[in-house]
Amino acid sequence: MKLTDHQQKMLDGAFGKGKAMAMQIQIGVGKCFDAERLVPVSRAHVSLSAQEADIWFAGKLLDAGASCAIAPTVNPGYSVDYFRSRLTDAAVENMRKTERIYRGLGARLTYCCTPYLADNVPSYGEIIAFSETNATLYANAVLGARTNRESAASALCAAVTGYAPEYGMLLQENRFADVAVRVDAKMESDFDYAVLGLCGKKIGKGIPAFLGLPEKISTEALIALGAELNVSGSYDLYHIPNVTAEAAHGFDLFGGKAPKREVTITQSDLEQTLEAFSPSADGSIEYCILGCPHYTYAQIEEVERLLGGEKAKADIHILTSAAIKRAAKESGLEDRLLDLGADLIADTCVDEACCWGYLAGKPGVTDSPKGAYYMETAGIRMAVRDTATCIHWAKQGRVC
């Protein structure tokens, strides 16, 4: 790879062993993808997990004297304050150690998986290094920024060095759609877009352009679409005419070429996809988990509306950012929800078995296929339904 004088000095250790280590990793990643050079990045987001490999790697950089050239935002681990009675002493120390390491590196401890909404919002064409698959897709597609689907390690190394290898989504020629996806279905709710995202098996590999969708799509629907595309497949970018950033800037979606494939997604496809992912449920419902990805304020308000003043018989857990939880507290929304059996949990991911293990074997429901996928890896099975159905079942404490 062609390195600048500054990059070569960093690799040679002129700025410390930690930065040299991070630079060596970035060069290695670049060589894997035939990148010719490293380019500056202005933002980073690290999919911190507070799990062993994450702590080991970040700790190794810190011990070598690394610090971040760009202060990255970070994904959630788990709230020790909320879950303290359910956590072992080892789990508490695990999260505390994560905090110490990332604070030492100079990260912004936002603990949120939707940084693009408030804490870390890139502009059109900005070169960044985001891990967290829903964040990568939202940044690339909806905002028109440029990031590869970074790992937690490579995003952290980008934050430490200030550089990322130039390949993939950083290059214009790789950002054209090559799969035309005609959507012939009723797209009436945010949840419909989540299920559309689950159709990755039929969409197949590539960059999809979704055709036939409404020109007004909510932020929450676009978040859901991106999150679930990377449950059912591996996607860096998608386009929607007159909705996503490049498609709204006169961008030639297919780069003057015919698409490699044309796919139609019907209403039947959506129904069959959901049924295959989450078979029919019956019996009691003991809990409902919402907020994977983290809920927006508008989504939390919708939960209150759906509850309609009726206290839920099943526990409702809503995961969100600390900033939104704080806003809900200040507005009185959090207290009203608590009275109705719904609690807001900040700084927490569903993919943390130490928090949620007590739910194993208990029947629950969620509006997030991604959340259900994560939970199942910990032996926790949840039905997946739209938000209105989730709240209706939670109010009754049973499938109805």
Question: Over which residues does each language-model region extend?
Answer:
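Non-transmembrane, aqueous-exposed alpha-helical and coiled segments at domain scale
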Residues: 1-400
